[in-house]
């Protein structure tokens, strides 16, 4: 891959046409409650008992965000994740309210695809992008049902895309499903799973009498940051021990076959290359420690307890909480993280030095 010195996003026409997109991308981890229990998913980010976010508090934050955007002359793109967002009893009401705000440029939600087709179809009245993470540990019957729903939803005029999770031991299903998606013209990415590094025994995903959470947000943030600072060698070792040799070779053989590109790599001569962020992860060129990064300016991340950070990486101090005062940053920051592994953080504007900021400003 040709050396690059800056990055900008292609996640919307505004991002593609303007160096400063004037859009705040909001990643909102709206709740831990989930109806799946994937082996590779941290107990901190999913369980079957956490309370749903209070509807009134959710509406209050949406109003505050819309007001901030008006004051800044910006719009917002908001992405809801979990847990499983659709298990919230008022999720459709929340989606409708978000879409009604004047500054809402895009509304994205990620789901495991397990809810009824009718619910997803109704959500498309307000959602501009529906992302389905297809997990393969739920059995063939569930997988086939979810694939059928995905293909049906893909007939809508909304942007539907799939994260086809490359689960160890299920690569025959991965390949078969990929062919089905190719035949149905479904946009998808075969997503390499990041091996878990924390001790799952420290927390539990199932409700027990008298149970209290072992970890709080701050403790989990430390673990998350430590994981991002793994060296190339450490990360490579994790992956090659998580997957079998054949599975690993298959993942390494995949080319950048996505049907859309979501980021622009800028080179020293001001030329650029458009690729998908997964290609950076595949080639392990997603380390930006020491770069100037615009998380907090172009993006914010909200954790399950309402704590707000600049990005999903949790770099820097918290900006506040959606239930209290929230101070938006005015300047980009120097990246302190070893590896940028979340798509939403990877596509945020960044430059290797101050010299190359002009490419993205």
Question: What do these predicted regions represent?
Answer:
Residues 1-24, 44, 287-294, 299, ...:
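Flexible mid-to-C-terminal extensions adjoining Fe-S/redox cofactors in radical SAM and related proteins
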Residues 129, 133-298, 304:
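Radical SAM enzyme [4Fe-4S]-AdoMet core and its adjacent flexible, acidic
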Residues 53-62, 355-360:
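Short cysteine/histidine-rich metal-coordination sites, predominantly Zn2+-binding motifs
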Residues 42, 67-69, 265-267:
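Glycine-rich short-loop/terminal segments
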Residues 37, 48-50, 87-89, 118, ...:
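Short catalytic/ligand-binding loop motif for oxyanion handling, primarily in non-cytosolic enzymes
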Residues 59-80, 88-181, 187-189:
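Radical SAM/AdoMet-radical enzyme domain recognition
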Residues 34, 38, 109, 306:
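Conserved, mostly hydrophobic/aromatic
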Residues 15-57, 312:
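Canonical Radical SAM [4Fe-4S] cluster-binding loop centered on the CxxxCxxC motif
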